[in-house]
Regions:
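Positively charged n-region of N-terminal signal peptides that target proteins for export
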Residues: 1-4
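First exposed extracellular module after export/assembly in secreted or surface-exposed proteins
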Residues: 26-161
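Repetitive helical segments and hydrophobic/amphipathic motifs
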Residues: 11-12
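Short, flexible loop motifs at catalytic/binding sites
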Residues: 7
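C-terminal motif of bacterial Sec signal peptides marking the signal peptidase cleavage site
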Residues: 15-18
Length: 161
């Protein structure tokens, strides 16, 4: 029984290390965030895989945003969940020419990076003999395919950091 309890506690510790909710960032990081996003509401801070993440809403822009910072507080990127109708025409055309207009899109994110790059990530599902697969495609605003990730367990955000 003690072994089971030990392994349960150890497993929960590993999960807690991966994503620490209710994190309080440094005053400098918090001030930089507030200056960049003065209209942000419902801000929650956490640590995720060594990064500081602010989850927030921007009224009139997106109800699901994340600003990612390095450990030292340097801003890396911000993601905004957006509607398919907000995709640039070039991005939607590139997606539909490759996958068809009838392919349902599960989600779209607009991403701004600290180096000035902007991109859109489209998520959709496809079915193969092995089962259902989540596909993530990253496009530049002019519709160029930048990257793709295929796996239900893979989080593309770590490649962007």
């Amino acid at each position: 029984m003690k072994k089971i309890l030990f392994f349960a506690v150890a497993l929960m510790s590993f999960v807690a290390i991966g994503c620490e909710k209710d994190y309080s960032p440094s005053p400098t990081t918090r001030a930089d965030f507030q200056q960049a996003y003065p209209d942000a509401v419902d801000v929650e801070w956490e640590r995720e895989h060594g990064h500081i993440v602010a989850e927030f809403k921007l009224p009139g822009v997106s109800n699901d945003c994340e600003a990612w910072f390095k450990k030292d507080g340097t801003w890396v990127l911000t993601t905004y969940d957006i509607k398919v109708s907000e995709l640039p025409e070039a991005v939607l055309n590139a997606f539909q020419s490759e996958y068809g207009a009838a392919t349902p899109i599960d989600g779209v994110e607009y991403i701004e990076k600290s180096n000035g790059d902007k991109q859109y990530v489209i998520e959709f599902e496809t079915f193969e003999a092995s089962g259902e697969i989540d596909v993530f495609l990253s496009y530049s605003p002019d519709g160029k395919l930048l990257n793709q990730w295929v796996n239900i367990y893979y989080d593309y955000i770590y490649d962007l950091l």
